[in-house]
Design a protein with these regions (language model features):
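C-terminal catalytic/acceptor-binding lobe
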Residues: 121, 126-129, 136-214
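Acidic donor-diphosphate engagement hotspot in glycosyltransferases and nucleotidyltransferases
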Residues: 15, 44-45, 68-72
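Short beta-strand-to-loop element that shapes/binds the nucleotide-sugar donor at the catalytic cleft/hinge
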Residues: 88-101
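Conserved donor-nucleotide/metal-binding helix-loop-beta segment in metal-dependent transferases, i.e.
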Residues: 69-87
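Glycine-rich, basic loop-to-helix element that forms the pyrophosphate-binding segment
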Residues: 36-51
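Acidic donor-binding segment of Leloir-type glycosyltransferases
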Residues: 1-33
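A recurrent flexible, glycine/aromatic-enriched loop bordering the glycosyltransferase active site
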Residues: 95, 110-129
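Short beta-strand-to-loop acidic/aromatic patch adjacent to the donor-nucleotide binding site
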Residues: 55-65
């Protein structure tokens, strides 16, 4: 790993600096970006991506638990095997049960089994991707007011890209109950989030139908 870029879109910069100081210099190069004023996720992603000078990007948020090692190396091998893979995801079949996925499992040349995500071909979930593929879309800020991942998926699917994920998962989502903009009660279930996502998609479809969003 050449560089670890962390963006903080809150007032917790000092806490992060103290945390990073425990690891900085131990064969890791950290770049901490603390926004002076809150910019939101999309602008924060753009700021981070402007710092990237490597061929590959591993994108991740802080509410994921990693279950085992080796995911970057294995993901890179699979990206090299098929240039039309936009993202190599790390979630299990069961964790992707709410979206269309392939019935079959496939075997990569490195011996890893994987399945294909049929509709949502681009995601902000943990996963390795090529920088040149990310650059095709450009700034993420233009997604403001839209369904981010739906728009990204449409863009990449129209260009023949796909997303795959490992049968034997590398991550587990631990952030459902601290999703700050969804429930003030902090008691969200997985079903709550699926319903919330569905409602947002329906709302966005109607807004697009009546020309409220482009």
């Amino acid at each position: 790993i050449k560089k670890i870029i962390i963006t903080e879109d809150s007032t917790e910069g000092k806490k992060l600096e103290r945390l990073i100081s425990k690891y900085d210099g131990k064969n890791q190069d950290f770049r901490l970006i603390v926004n002076e004023t809150r910019l939101g996720q999309l602008k924060s992603i753009d700021k981070a991506y402007r710092e990237i000078d490597t061929e590959y990007i591993f994108h991740c948020e802080d509410d994921w638990e990693f279950l085992r090692e080796g995911f970057i190396e294995k993901s890179m091998e699979m990206l090299k095997e098929d240039p039309k893979i936009a993202v190599v995801g790390l979630r299990s079949r069961e964790d992707c049960s709410g979206i269309p996925i392939s019935k079959e499992n496939y075997m990569a040349s490195n011996g890893e089994e994987y399945f294909e995500i049929l509709e949502d071909v681009f995601t902000y979930n943990p996963g390795l991707r090529r920088k040149d593929v990310c650059d095709l879309f450009g700034s993420h800020e233009k997604l403001e007011g839209k369904l981010w991942e739906a728009e990204l998926s449409k863009f990449y699917k129209e260009r023949g890209y796909k997303m795959i994920s490992f049968v034997n998962p590398f991550v587990e989502h631990i952030g459902n109950k601290r999703h700050v903009h969804f429930s003030k009660r902090g008691k969200n279930s997985v079903l709550d989030f699926k319903i919330d996502r569905m409602v947002k998609k329906i709302r966005y479809t109607f807004l697009k139908l009546f020309g409220k969003v482009k």
